[in-house]
Amino acid sequence: MTAREALRAGLMAALRPALTPLGVSLFDAVPVRASVPQAVLGEPGDSDWGAAGIEGRELRVALTLTDEGEQPRRLRLCVQAAEAIGLAGVLADGWRVAGLSMTGTRMAKTGARWTASVEWRARLWRVGQ
């Protein structure tokens, strides 16, 4: 399993219990048909982050949240819930989390819909693979 796949699986596992109580449907790809509120975890971009004998990757990934309404009250709660998640220390296939930090959030209204994004940087490593 790649670092990208391990990170996506770990984030999905952490986000689901944070967002489900708020009525948000979580997807790992843009759904063809889905009602709001919804959240879509994007594809991570990655780069090398390792040392001698250690395989490491630095990944950046964004969660896009969509809702409707006059004001983004529920969307703000969703962003707060996403900001508060943490990852398990060990992910799939031996990938270990060296760090997870939120790098930014954004919110905007287009027509009747509000869209927010939460972006993270993760550093993962493993030995002997």
Enumerate the language-model features and the residues they cover:
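Charged, amphipathic alpha-helical segments and their flanking helix caps
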Residues: 1-29, 43-129
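Short acidic/glycine-enriched loop/turn segments that link adjacent beta-strands
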Residues: 34-36, 112
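Charged, often glycine-rich, active-site loop that binds/positions anionic groups
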Residues: 36-44
